[in-house]
Amino acid sequence: MKAGIEKWGKRMRRGVACSAAVGGLLMSTAFVGKEPSYAPVGKAHAQPAATPDFSLVGFATQNGGTTGGAGGRTVTAATLEELTKYAKSNDPLIIRISGKISAGAQGASINVKSNKTLLGVGATGFLEGVGLNISGQKNIIVQNLKLTMSTVTNTYTNDEGRQQVALNDGDCITIQNGSTNVWVDHCELFNLDPVAQPNQDLYDGLIDAKGNSAYITISWCYFHDHHKCHLIGSSDKDDADRKVTFHHNYYYNITERVPVYRFGTGHVFNNYYQHVYGTGVNSRMGACLKVEKNYFEDTKDPITTKNSAQPGKWDASDNYFTACKGNQPTTSTCTLTLPYIYTNVVTKTAEVKAVVTQWAGVGKL
């Protein structure tokens, strides 16, 4: 791993060839740092002419749907105290977050109760050292916010003998204890370059979901500079029938877990992966993931099942691989029929890179 990290950290581009597949066809080799030879991808960098459809799709539309604080008052939080007060209110609220809210080196964890929308104002909403804890709650939207735990120095020594942030399970956003109907959209989450900061446990997940949490959609977010991105299911004993959709997210400079997914069913489509050098989509413990129309670039084991007592499965189609290595399946090991319509938001595989890099993250709504 160390050698792989050092190689990646130097951004080596020496014409290492790998296969490229679209629509189940294995194409000719493509070279690292160059455009793939597959013809349609030549259009992938053209700027999309129109704003995409940003409406909610995926598992968060099920189980009664996800509306957040709709119907409640709209309030503005400019301080940590205001955000804490509004987030723990029993009333439905749309909480506008204006500017940077910082918890300093000590850090803070905000408990978010049901029927809330946390909405960043313009491109200014920034939670620095402030984690969001969604525990046993329902109907929550987190949108247009930037989050990091990288400023927190409040740590403890974990069971592996490594330092770990001592609040919010080390996560930027924790969804746990049976929380349902959560939509995280157009956010940016990051910590530190994993090459420069080698302790993989210091910050845990950017967004983790565990303990029977389900009906979650994570869309149009920018995740970067982090080791372990998404833990969906905390262990091989966390056997809930979880249901999570990931679409139109941009993953850059990530080690692994994009996501790691145990049990249940999931949907991973139209995401762009760039410089993911541990594992990509890692299906474990019998999970069946529909993985379609994603663009994988410079990614190790883009779709795989690893480090699991029981292998996971995938329903894979129309994914594109360039400058990748390891497992790049073009056939499926399970079949997943989804309970929702999403054709209105689907992007052609060849256009995913351009669309996602332009429209994912904060300030794009």
Task: Locate the predicted segments by residue.
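Extracellular beta-strand-rich solenoid/capping regions of secreted or surface-exposed proteins
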Residues: 84-92, 101-119, 125-144, 149-179
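Extracellular beta-strand solenoid repeats
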Residues: 76, 96, 111, 119, ...
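Extracellular beta-strand/beta-solenoid scaffold signature
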Residues: 128-132, 156-175, 197-210, 225-238, ...
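Extracellular "leader-to-stem" segments immediately downstream of a signal peptide or signal-anchor
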Residues: 2-94, 104, 325-365
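Extracellular beta-rich repeat passengers
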Residues: 260-365
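Short strand-loop junctions, especially beta-strand C-caps/beta-turns
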Residues: 80, 100, 233-235
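Repetitive beta-strand solenoid architecture
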Residues: 71, 91, 97, 106, ...
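Right-handed parallel beta-helix
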Residues: 115-121, 138-151, 179-195, 203, ...
